[in-house]
Amino acid sequence: MSRVAKAPVTLPNGVSVTLNDRQVEVKGKNGNMSLRLHELVELKQEDDAIIFSPTVDSKEAMMHTGTMRSLLNNLVIGVNEGFEKRLQLIGVGYRAQAAGNKVTLNVGYSHPVEYTLPEGVSAETPTQTEIVLKSNDKQQLGQAAADIRGFRPPEPYKGKGIRYSDEHVIRKEAKKK
């Protein structure tokens, strides 16, 4: 069986999980989230731990078991603590502003770029060159961060662009005569 699937998901205090006809609902202090359980995976709850197991003994079932365990673990963390991603804008005149559900970026184009955040994702700008995205949904948060980064990905020669705060950009040397 998948090594990931062997580890049970532990439920912290204040988080409850209910299973209704292959639909798993997770409730916590940051809201509710749900997940559709794959037909090759079954789960059982023991005290404050959830154990996953495949319904049939096949490689595909084991793969789905590990995936479902990771997805449910992300839901539990999301409704309990939430997720955060930080983006940095590096370049002369590059700046960002967050207002409501929109992020306005000035990243070297002739016009400011406006990005509408998906529902459930919030943004704040502690400085003009930093964006902090927060959400309960890890997948939605990562997609929003990737969309914003896609407006001006970091380039390898000067390093200008929008990058994740923990991203390392490999620099290239300019062509020599």
Curated annotation (Swiss-Prot):
SUPFAM superfamilies: Ribosomal protein L6. Residues 143-162 are annotated as: Disordered. It holds the Pfam family Ribosomal_L6. PROSITE patterns: RIBOSOMAL_L6_1. Residues 149-162 have a biased composition (Basic and acidic residues). One of its GO terms (molecular function) is rRNA binding. Keywords: Ribonucleoprotein, Ribosomal protein, RNA-binding, rRNA-binding. Signal peptide: none annotated. Coiled coil: none annotated. One of its GO terms (cellular component) is cytosolic large ribosomal subunit. GO terms for biological process: cytoplasmic translation. Belongs to the universal ribosomal protein uL6 family. This protein binds to the 23S rRNA, and is important in its secondary structure. It is located near the subunit interface in the base of the L7/L12 stalk, and near the tRNA binding site of the peptidyltransferase center. Part of the 50S ribosomal subunit. This is Large ribosomal subunit protein uL6. It comes from Psychrobacter cryohalolentis (strain ATCC BAA-1226 / DSM 17306 / VKM B-2378 / K5).
